Amino acid sequence: MGTVHHMTRRGKYARRLDPALWVYIDRVNEWYPPEIAELPIAEQRAVYDAMCRAFHPGHPPGLSASDGLVAAAARDIPVRGYRLAGKAPQAIVVYYHGGGFVLGGLDSHDDICAEICAATGFEVLSADYRLAPEHLHPAAFDDALAVFEWVAATSALPIVLCGESAGGNLAAAVAHATRRHPRRAAGQVLIYPGLGGDEAGRSYIEHAEAPLLTLGDIDFYRRIRSAPGQSPDDPTFSPLRDSDFSGLPPTFVITAECDPLSSDGEAYRDRIVAAGGSAWWQEEPRLVHSFLRARKNVPRAGEAFLDILSAIASVTMLGAGDGDLISPLVGEMAGRPEGGAKDREPSGS
């Protein structure tokens, strides 16, 4: 990383990833180089937030966003709600942002939430959960659960749990904790989540040094949010370590091929299906962790984001028993054996 522009060491990924994606990767590493981990947390967050602003394309037309607070036992939790003018929402998405449990907030993923709302017509509520290291587990989970419970108590709409990376972990943990709730989630959509999977898994080995997320990064983020004596088998910390995968809502997991966490999505799909549930896993070829921010400039990331939007729009319909209600993507996924998504093969070297 010694050059002025922090050019990423490309190694085996040099030809595996599209040139447009490399432009994105290098841009992220210019903003947020690995050595930034040596700075105080407040400075890391300031740089991360500035990077997120630089990638923000603005809100789609016809969208309104408003901030509020959800009263919880520990504190009032900031939230931001999104609605599309002239559209009666058919569901509400509770969104948990990424950032390794250390970074991010309502602004960092504002554009993604806005675009989910605009594309689906659903209400979206983004949760500003507490961050590590100031607040160790289960603080983030407690906030995530409190926001779900508030939505369940105040909205009659079907609830979709959604999150990316660390937020995908929280969404899944909430789904497990609330599966017997009278207003349990109608579906969950997890975007390259870290679920506490077996690090002997395929992607952990093959992509241990992938661009933008390495095995070392995963270990750092796990340790920084762990309270003393934290059990890795706690399902509110590592949903894949749960002993019971029954009763979970219809689930879509979308992962990136070149991401050590991808095997978590595959394993999670398999556990839910084995327990009699409905789950689909889709590994997006030639993409890396955090590809959502590349959706405007990298065609492959844009295609993957459309898959995500289709999954969010469709997941609440899976219990309706009407195939006409299911989007083409969901129909294609649901037609695969073992209730799984088509596991795409890379279409390039």
Regions found by a protein language model. Give the residues of each.
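Glycine-biased, low-complexity coil/linker segments
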Residues: 331-332
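Short beta-strand element of the alpha/beta-hydrolase
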Residues: 90-99
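A fold-wide structural signal in alpha/beta-hydrolase
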Residues: 92, 121-125
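Alpha/beta hydrolase fold serine-hydrolase catalytic domain that processes acyl esters and thioesters
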Residues: 172-320
